[in-house]
Curated annotation (Swiss-Prot):
Component of the complex WDR11 composed of C17orf75, FAM91A1 and WDR11; FAM91A1 and WDR11 are required for proper location of the complex. Interacts with GLI3; the interaction associateS EMX1 with GLI3. Interacts with TBC1D23; this interaction may be indirect and recruits TBC1D23 to AP-1-derived vesicles. Interacts (via the N-terminal and the central portion of the protein) with EMX1. It is found in: Cytoplasm, Cytoskeleton, Cilium basal body; Cytoplasm; Nucleus; Cytoplasm, Cytoskeleton, Cilium axoneme. This is WD repeat-containing protein 11. The gene is Wdr11. It comes from Mus musculus. InterPro entries: WD40/YVTN_repeat-like_dom_sf, WD40_repeat_CS, WD40_repeat_dom_sf, WD40_rpt, WDR11.
């Protein structure tokens, strides 16, 4: 049998409570899987899976307004490890960048003293992963190096900046939301500030007038047009228009390029920035609850919306191909009429009051299948999306188009029997919305699903102050087997919260009183007394509540029975050292003494009894001598059984009978009534000493008042030391043995409480004042540490106690309870020292070498020919402690994830994708998503299952294409269809001539000449562009392929381009099918993204590949340095050998080796001498990197695969192995 152990280790920690209004937007969910939020001046870090507090960061001196986790969009290795970095900003303009795992500030940044409006890490991390952009009020944006705290540049703007948003598709695009409108910046760069003032636009809406209310009945396109009354203009709105200044939020849509949303309380506007117009409005019905916040998804075109009642809703864009027209109306000829987001799921609302309201929402950036709600009272509610297959009856009951589960899982289409985890991420839950007008492929098995929110995590904060705190009796050798470090916290609403201080979790919440708890005293390790008093009536009388609570059962008993109504309020309760007796002190009523064991009143003092200002029980008693007497009695009784009756004298017999009676009584009550004594002081400072034994109370001695002391407010007694505190801040130390006293003026005003630390011989004492606290050594009569509210300490102390012999507990008015070292310095702790109830999966907590070795262990299954998650079987000669930590991480994985990792049918590509999700590795997730898609496409084409179209994309992939959030990386055919759908919507929504002209330009580039001509002919005769548009319409319809006309148009186009009219020249070249030339011109003039777009929509696969390869060279150039983007473009082109070469040249050895293995499996490499050399070099370099991680077994595997290139390393590894086995 294992020895019974009790965990009583208590770490320094902070229990947090309700939030401050400034903390409203201070929350972020990192790629690392952790949620950070601001609570007053603290930053709290919790695990999203288990809802456990992992860290509380304390260094800010003011309220936190923003927190942001660093992005993980870079290649991780020993030099750039997995680490927990977080930036937090406060109302005084200070930004702190933290190493969260160690709990230390890496750097502090200060520019101005006004609240930081917004702060974000740059998402493109190829050049540097340390760049942080901040808004310093009123109108500055500053780029910082967050590693060193260096200011790189600063730029001011004309208007006050409220927030900003980076374009997730282009790192050079940044948009500012200002008090006046929106500013678009298109030349953002880490190396220098933006050049000009940016392009400023205003959002406005017409005034409602009778003319607007009497719109003619409209159908089709006009009907949709009338719904959009929002204009985006570069001029300030005129008097006829209302500027929409109440914009709550601005954000780019990560699901499709050049789209942005603007959030207003009652509507969400979707803008298409290509034509600068509103293409969709999500409005709330009149009775609906207004929006507070919206988070757009990237994996699917969906929106997480937070409403004012705390309800989170998920809206997903409707797919139109599955809607059948059932009405008698004529069906619309144009399939796309409206950009509609259907409500797909919503969670329960919270009860909103004056003090309890939703603050903010964050969404899991890795999987986009969970949202966390931060409530003002300190609660964190984690809602997870779950998918369920619809039953036939439930289908289409709501009237919205159905959602289907995707064909593939982790990037690869799987069979019906393959293990899947549909709730892994949003894109594994629901398939893509098909492009409008496109039917689902015949014969494909589509399962209709519906989504629901499930509350999977709840973290509750402390209620708002006031607090009365009391630590349970201390650990001793006698209670070591049952001891738990419990802290009782009395609250203002009458409940008592009991916290387990090893884990910091709420152990029990007990509703004990009907009003504020004034004090708590423990009567044993499992029971306590608490008291409260109602508001005084006109006579100053109250209803006193004194309850005895049994913790295991939660049962609460009125300790004083029916007493308590209409009497003077209880001032304090004091439990004797042996927990036998209770002294109850009232404000204007004599003292009561009670027996705790029997709940009986021993004595109510007479009315002449002096008023008590302070009282304390003595630690000395006569229990030991009583026990000795009891033992002697037992021995005498034992002797009595041996001696004959005749030999007994009459006197001895009567003594024995009395002792037997006493013994039986003691056994009945299971307790001996020992003599205990206490001291108290009156208003004059006189000290009284009383003795209590059984039901007798005796007055022992009186000590006259000390002239140097004011009115005594508190007493503490331990061993031979008695300490008194007074109203004037004096502490008087009495040495009872030496009969000397020493008065110390602390100059700290009223001494509110003094308490000795637990532990034999520990003479430390904590004293609490109005403005702070001090720890004293009463042996030396010296102050050990001090804490004073003020500039450096932002909180005021409400109550104090000792947690252990060397740690104190402070309850403060910021709603927090801090467990601190005796120095009382607020310090963060190392996260790996935390005692957690549930294991937490977070490889970021491991040392860098171990985190990377664990990743290799998961990726390269099976080991020793079998799939295993037991690392002890692996030849990994690190110290046992690290191996134990790795095994703990593996145990923390969910059973569903373990099942996938141990599945032999789970392919290498799927494993890479899953591990990138588990690690929250943004860079790897994007790489393996695109790699899996195109490698699988290639294998399908090679196997002959599909016909390869001339664009190079197998046809079956068009029914399961790469998500449009990957933009130009998608298959050409799918990309073209998406662009046509988009221009359809733009055409339907156009509301001005300017919009019409932009639509015409797009249609001409897309080759939709007939529709372009229709729009050109719509120009009215009084428009200044009427003549040009008419001629252009004639030109477009009469363009022939004859040599002379082509030559003329080409000459005009090149002249236009040379004279600064690039867009017009490109358009003319597209008219004569010279789109390849147009792309070259665009690239020459630096319009690389536009050239890629045009190549995708107009060129055949070979020409398109040429354009994109030139773009790759540009992206890899030192001045651009976007190699990670270049890798994705090469993957989309099927240039797999080039990808492997580039990965190797970038020293991404782990990714290169895995990619080579996947390519060999899918037959993606043409075998040649060069490729074989490349593969051997990659394997050898990867083996060396595994050796540097200490992962010898992995190093041996890849060194042996590298052939001649790995021979030396293999010999080296072999000799190391022999040395180890010999030792």
């Amino acid at each position: 049998m294992l020895p019974y152990t009790v965990n009583f280790k208590v770490s320094a920690r902070t229990l947090t409570g309700a939030l401050n209004a400034h903390n409203k937007a201070a929350v972020d969910w990192g790629w690392q899987g952790l949620i950070a939020y601001g609570c007053h001046s603290l930053v709290v870090v919790i695990d999203s899976n288990t809802a456990q507090t992992l860290q509380v960061l304390e260094k800010h001196k003011a309220d936190i307004v923003k927190v942001r986790w660093a992005r993980e969009n870079y290649h991780h290795n020993i030099g750039s490890p997995y680490c927990l970095r977080l930036a937090s900003a406060d109302v005084t303009g200070k930004i702190i960048v933290w190493d969260v795992a160690a709990g230390v500030a890496q750097c502090e940044i200060q520019e101005h003293v006004k609240p930081i409006q917004d702060v974000q890490w740059l998402w493109n991390q190829d050049a540097s992963r340390d760049l942080l952009l901040a808004i310093h009020p009123p109108n500055y944006i500053v780029l910082w190096n967050a590693d060193t705290g260096t200011k790189l540049w600063k730029k001011s703007y004309a208007d006050n900046i409220l927030s900003f948003s980076f374009d997730p598709f282009d790192p050079s695009h940044l948009t500012l939301l200002t008090s006046e409108g929106i500013v678009f910046i298109s030349d953002f760069s880490p190396s220098k500030p933006p050049s000009g003032p940016g392009k400023k636009v205003y959002i406005s809406s017409p005034h409602s007038s009778p003319a607007h209310n009497k719109l003619a009945a409209a159908t089709g396109a006009k009907k949709a047009l009338n719904k959009v009354k929002i204009l985006i203009t570069q001029e300030k709105p005129s008097a006829d228009f209302v500027a929409l200044n109440d914009c709550l939020q601005l954000a780019y849509l990560p699901s499709k390029r050049n789209h942005m949303l603007l959030l207003y309380p009652r509507e969400i506007l979707i803008l298409d920035l290509e034509v600068n117009q509103t293409v969709g409005v999500i409005a709330i019905e009149r009775t609906g609850v207004p929006f507070l916040q919206v988070i757009p998804c990237s994996q699917r075109d969906g929106l997480f919306c937070l409403h004012e009642n705390g309800c989170i809703t998920l809206r997903v864009r409707r797919s139109y191909n599955s809607i059948c027209t059932t009405s008698n109306d004529e069906p619309d000829l144009d399939p796309v009429q409206e950009l509609t987001y259907d409500l797909r799921s919503q969670c329960d609302a919270i009860r909103v009051t004056k003090t309890v309201r939703p603050f903010s929402m964050v969404c899991c950036p890795v999987n986009e299948n969970a949202a966390a709600l931060i409530v003002s009272d300190g609660r964190v509610m984690i809602w997870e999306l779950k998918s369920a297959v619809c039953s036939r009856n439930a289908r289409n009951s709501s009237g919205v188009s159905p959602l289907y589960s995707p064909v593939s899982f982790c990037g690869i289409p799987g069979g019906v029997l393959q293990n899947k985890l549909p709730d892994l991420s949003l894109d594994n839950m629901i398939g893509q919305s098909a492009i409008a007008g496109e039917e689902h492929p015949k014969g494909s098995i589509l399962q209709e699903v519906h989504l629901k929110f499930l509350l999977t995590g709840l973290l509750s904060g402390l209620p708002s102050p006031q607090f009365a705190i009391r630590m349970c009796p201390p650990l001793t050798t006698k209670n070591i087997k049952t001891y738990q470090p419990l802290l009782a916290v009395g609250t203002s609403n009458g409940s008592v919260l009991v916290y387990h201080l090893t884990s910091g979790l709420l152990h029990k919440e007990l509703s004990v009183h009907s009003c504020e708890v004034k004090g708590i005293e423990w009567t044993s390790l499992t029971s306590f007394l608490s008291f409260a008093a109602s508001t005084p009536n006109n006579m100053g009388l109250v209803r006193n509540e004194l309850q005895l609570v049994d913790l295991p059962t939660g049962r609460s008993t009125a300790f004083r029975g029916d007493r308590g109504n209409d009497e003077s309020p209880i001032e304090m309760i004091k439990v004797s050292h042996l927990k036998q007796y209770l002294a109850v002190v009232f404000k204007d009523k004599p003292l009561e003494l009670w027996d705790i064991r029997t709940c009986t009143l021993l004595r109510e003092m007479s009315k002449s009894f002096p008023a008590i200002t302070a009282l304390e029980w003595s630690p000395s008693h006569n229990l030991k001598s009583l026990r000795k007497k009891q033992l002697a009695t037992r021995e005498a009784m034992a002797r009595q059984t041996v001696v004959s009756d005749a030999e007994l004298g009459a006197v001895e017999s009567s003594v024995i009978s009395l002792l037997q009676e006493a013994e039986s009584k003691a056994e009945l009550s299971q307790n001996i009534s020992a003599r205990e004594h206490f001291v108290f002081t009156d208003n004059d400072g006189q000290v009284y000493h009383l003795t209590v034994e059984g039901n007798s109370v005796k007055d022992s001695a009186r000590i006259p008042p000390d002239g140097s002391m004011g009115s005594i407010t508190c007493i503490a007694w331990k061993g031979d030391t008695l300490v008194l505190g007074d109203m004037d801040g004096n502490l008087n130390f009495w040495d009872l043995k030496a009969r000397v006293s020493r008065g110390i003026p602390t100059h700290r005003s009223w001494v509110r409480k003094i308490r000795f630390a637990p532990g034999k011989g520990n003479q430390k004492l904590i004293a609490m004042y109005n403005d702070g606290a001090e720890v004293w050594d009463t042996k030396e009569v010296q102050m050990v540490s001090s804490l004073r509210s003020g500039r450096n300490v932002t909180f005021r102390i409400l109550d104090v106690d000792w947690c252990t012999s060397d740690k104190v507990i402070l309850a403060s008015d910021d709603g927090c309870i801090r467990v601190l070292e005796m120095s009382m310095k607020s310090t963060c702790f190392r996260m790996d020292e935390q005692e957690l109830v549930e294991p937490v999966w977070c490889p970021y907590l491991l040392v860098p070498r171990a985190a990377l070795a664990l990743k290799a262990f998961l990726l390269h299954q099976p080991w020793n020919g079998r799939y295993s998650l037991d690392i002890s079987h692996i030849d990994y000669p690190e110290n046992e402690e690290i191996k134990t930590l790795l095994q703990e991480q593996l145990h923390a994985l969910s059973n569903d994830i373990k099942k996938l990792l141990l599945d032999p049918d789970f392919s290498l590509l799927q494993r890479c994708l899953l591990v990138s999700r588990l690690y929250g590795d943004e860079s790897e997730l994007h790489f393996w998503t695109v790699a899996a898609h195109y490698l699988h496409s290639l294998s399908q084409a090679k196997s002959g299952d599909t016909v390869v179209t001339k664009e190079g994309a197998p046809k079956d992939r068009l029914s399961n294409p790469l998500d449009i959030c990957y933009d130009v990386l998608c298959e050409n055919t799918y990309f073209q269809k998406f662009q046509l759908e988009r221009v359809n919507l733009q055409e339907v929504k156009r509301s001005t001539y300017d919009h019409t002209r932009k639509c015409t330009d797009q249609l001409l580039l897309l080759g939709q000449t007939d529709r372009a001509v229709q729009l050109l002919l719509e120009t009215s005769a009084d428009n200044q562009h009427y003549y040009c548009d008419s001629l252009k319409a004639c030109l477009v319809t009469t363009v022939t392929s004859s040599g002379p006309s082509q030559s003329t148009i080409k000459l005009v186009a090149t002249n236009m381009i040379a004279n600064g009219k690039l867009a017009e020249g490109v358009q003319l070249l597209c008219l004569i099918d010279k789109a390849a030339d147009a792309c070259r011109y665009l690239q020459t003039y630096g319009e690389w993204n536009r050239a890629a777009w045009l190549a995708k929509v107009r060129l055949n696969s070979e020409e398109c590949a040429d354009v994109l390869k030139r773009w790759v060279d540009h992206l890899c150039s030192p001045q651009v340095n976007q190699k990670s983007k270049a890798l994705l473009v090469l993957l989309s082109l099927g240039c797999f050998v080039s990808v492997a070469e580039t990965l190797h040249s970038m020293r991404y050895f782990d990714r290169a080796a895995l990619f080579v293995e996947a390519c060999l499996k899918y037959g993606a490499f043409e075998v040649s001498e060069d490729t074989e050399k490349l593969i051997a070099a990659i394997y050898a370099d990867y083996a060396r990197s595994l050796k540097s991680l200490g992962f010898r077994q992995g190093a041996v595997r890849f060194a042996s695969k590298a052939g001649a290139a790995g021979r030396d390393l293999l010999n080296e590894l072999g000799s190391t192995k022999e040395e180890l086995t010999e030792s």
